[in-house]
Regions:
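Pyridoxal 5′-phosphate
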Residues: 1-393
Length: 393
């Protein structure tokens, strides 16, 4: 139904089921960037001629669009970055470095693990991991125990697992963390592609956002910073566009958000991100969530008909990604064969090696949906999987 809005599907006969890695881009996103490059390509926040002013206005409008999209309080609470990985690294270095303890979950992407290791944190030494149960559900009892034993910790938790699609109850996580004086960052890389996020309701202190996983351009992201923490945030990088005054003795920086956006930003990408969000507003999250829930259910039902299939969680409290293996087969081999049948999915550990190790596996076959996927895509996948299995067994 919605594939007509995405040029990729006009130019490809691939069944695209790798949306957790990146999503396709609607025409509005592509056209907004072409318009910038062809009609008013200029730098922002510097020159004062007409096209430069237009570029700055479009850039700042993108910040406003994002603010309204997630229901932030002020434009200044949104800082543009290259993506979620940079957003997490930014907060890890600029804010959370001095916290005695960082708490994450078992389901984290490497981008929410390695930055903490780079600070010298290891398991039990300033670094704690919340357990998950046999269905990959967040262990709230263990979380509360960690909070009690580590007062005023920094909590950094993914909203939706990129590897398994498991949804964490981030509102309850934030409530419990705040009860014990902790500060909370949410990795929202997978969030906005699948569900509406109301930052006021969630009450996260930081929320990391990806554009390219939300039908926007690559190389763009943002970090939401609750206003009260902006004054405590140190500049991660400095240089052009961050400066108020400079001499050879000292420098003073601008106020947020500009003090945190050093150098020329990905102007076209940020304008394109605003176009993606406006497109999603047009489609409507009621439609997006209803379509995805239906196709996700159908995917699960059809996969379960395949003999010897192994899952690691049920579909309750999950969305987007469905990970599995076939007993006796190597996931890489399956991936190679279905690729030859024009099915695009991902095999491997999905940048989540710790949870794979915990499950005693090297990786999975991952199918990840977006709202433009339909029953026909699932049917094509099932045919390809059955052929691959018959060839490998």
């Amino acid at each position: 139904m919605f594939k007509k809005d995405f040029p990729y599907f006009e130019n490809s006969d691939i069944i695209y089921l790798d949306n957790a890695a990146t999503t396709q881009k609607p025409k509005e996103v592509v056209n907004s960037q072409i318009e910038y490059y062809e009609h008013y390509c200029s730098n922002t926040h510097r020159s004062n001629f007409g096209h430069a002013n237009k570029a700055t206005q479009k850039f700042e409008n993108a910040r406003k669009v994002l603010k309204e999209f997630i229901n932030a309080s002020k434009n200044e609470e949104l800082i543009f970055t290259k993506g979620v990985s940079e957003s997490i690294n930014f907060i890890a270095e600029s804010f959370a470095k001095d916290f005695k303890t960082v708490i994450i979950s078992s389901l984290e992407h490497h981008s929410n693990i390695v930055p903490w290791h780079m600070q010298g944190r290891t398991l039990g030494a300033g670094f704690e991991v919340v357990k998950c149960d046999d269905n990959l559900s967040f262990d709230f009892a263990h979380f509360e125990e960690l909070l009690k034993n580590n007062p005023k910790a920094f909590v950094s938790i993914t909203h939706i697992s990129n590897a398994f699609g498991k949804i964490h109850d981030i509102k309850t996580i934030c409530e419990l963390a705040h009860k014990y004086g902790a500060v909370v960052m949410i990795d929202g890389a997978q969030s906005l592609a699948h569900m509406k996020v109301d930052i006021q309701s969630i009450d996260a202190d930081f929320f990391a956002i990806s554009a390219h996983k939300t039908f926007g351009p690559t190389g763009v992201g943002a970090i939401y910073v609750k206003e009260k923490y902006l004054k405590d945030l140190k500049a991660y990088q400095t240089g052009g566009a961050t400066i108020d005054q400079v001499d050879f003795e000292k420098s003073t920086l601008l106020d947020a958000p500009y003090k945190f956006e050093a150098g020329t930003q990905n102007i076209a990408g940020i304008i394109g991100f605003a176009a993606a969000l406006e497109y999603l507003n047009h489609v409507g999250y009621e439609n997006i969530e209803a379509i995805e829930k239906d196709v996700y259910q159908y995917l699960d039902e059809e996969l379960r008909k395949i003999p010897d299939i192994e899952f690691y969680n049920d579909i309750e409290d999950s969305i987007g990604s469905r990970s599995f293996n076939i007993k006796g087969l190597i996931h890489d081999d399956v991936g190679i064969l279905v690729d030859k049948m024009k099915i695009a999915l991902r095999v491997g550990h999905h940048c989540a090696q710790p949870i794979m190790n915990q499950l005693g596996i090297k990786g999975t076959i991952r199918v990840s949906l977006a709202f433009y996927n339909d029953y026909n895509d699932v049917d094509a996948l099932i045919v390809a999987l059955k052929k691959a299995i018959s060839m490998l067994k």
